[in-house]
């Protein structure tokens, strides 16, 4: 059954709209056509979402290793999709030190969003460097993702609203944890989740830090911020923590452990996806969410996307078209 389902997935992806090998953020599940959910400019390739897709496909490929026709076809399909992603196209111009998030077939680089860490896009640079046909130079890891040029510093300082970490490196101590890399005190927890679904942070060390250790510190900082609970929000504590991206009462926001980015909304995925970093603290959150709040937080498909006990609200989904 798993093999048949995966053949259906790869067959669909082969026929879906692609833009220099990259897929769009949202795809119509019936037709494979692009859904410009975020507006008319969002009608082309999304390199970051493409990288999330491919870390999953490449990981799954390792499991389908039998020499039967169906599993061979899965491997061939994934190989073809993978080899035809034109990572280097998304540099925008030949000597660019950065990758760019979007490209539109009729509006080109109108969104013009450079990929600069620290955020969820590390996996994009890693896969682009490994690209078998259209790869980028490994030097772009430091010139793009970990850039320390003035533009990158301004970008980080702007979204973080602090100077901490604007150089990509940080070095400050928060709640007893010395953070080597990251803007502010780490940001929303999906930064330490998304890129590491296919990339093992234990085994990845650059000239600044080991990323399992650095990510673990971010998870601990997030929990301790919630224990301190500067905003006085209902429920926060050692078993209710994990600020990250989610829907909330008024829209969508990437919640993070800073007062100006925290409105009392908690997403179960924050603590639960941090199990590899904080197994004991994550288990406390899991038990609390299920045993004490399961009546409204647990549904047919598991935990709901987010809840806010201060305003008595639970939410079902995130970024659903």
Residue ranges and their predicted role:
Residues 1-319:
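Ser/Thr/Asn(+Pro)-rich, low-complexity disordered segments
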């Amino acid at each position: 059954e798993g093999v048949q389902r995966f053949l259906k997935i790869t067959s669909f992806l082969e026929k879906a709209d692609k833009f220099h090998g990259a897929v769009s953020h949202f795809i119509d599940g019936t037709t494979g056509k692009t859904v410009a959910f975020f507006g008319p400019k969002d009608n082309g390739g999304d390199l970051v979402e493409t990288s999330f897709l491919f870390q999953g496909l490449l990981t799954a490929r390792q499991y389908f290793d039998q020499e039967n026709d169906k599993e061979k076809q899965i491997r061939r399909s994934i190989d073809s999709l993978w080899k035809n992603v034109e990572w280097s196209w998304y540099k925008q111009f030949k000597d660019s030190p950065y990758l760019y998030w979007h490209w539109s077939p009729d509006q080109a680089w109108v969104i013009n969003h450079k990929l600069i860490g620290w955020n969820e896009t590390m996996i994009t640079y890693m896969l682009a460097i490994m690209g078998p046909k259209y790869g980028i130079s490994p030097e772009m890891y430091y010139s793009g993702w970990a850039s320390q040029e003035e533009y990158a510093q301004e970008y980080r300082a702007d979204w973080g609203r602090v100077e901490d970490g604007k150089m990509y490196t940080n070095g400050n101590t928060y709640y007893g944890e010395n953070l080597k890399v990251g803007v502010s005190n780490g940001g929303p927890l999906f930064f330490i989740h998304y890129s590491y679904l296919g990339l093992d942070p234990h085994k990845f060390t650059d000239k600044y830090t080991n990323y399992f250790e650095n990510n673990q510190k971010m998870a601990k900082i997030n929990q301790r911020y919630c224990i301190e609970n500067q905003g006085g929000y209902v429920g926060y504590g050692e078993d209710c923590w994990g600020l990250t991206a989610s829907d909330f009462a008024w829209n969508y926001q990437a919640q993070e452990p800073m007062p100006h980015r925290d409105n009392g909304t908690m997403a179960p995925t924050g603590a639960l996806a941090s199990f590899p970093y904080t197994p004991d603290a994550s288990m406390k959150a899991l038990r609390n969410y299920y045993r004490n709040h399961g009546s409204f937080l647990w549904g047919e498909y598991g935990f709901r996307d987010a809840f806010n006990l201060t305003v008595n609200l639970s939410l079902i989904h995130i970024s659903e078209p």
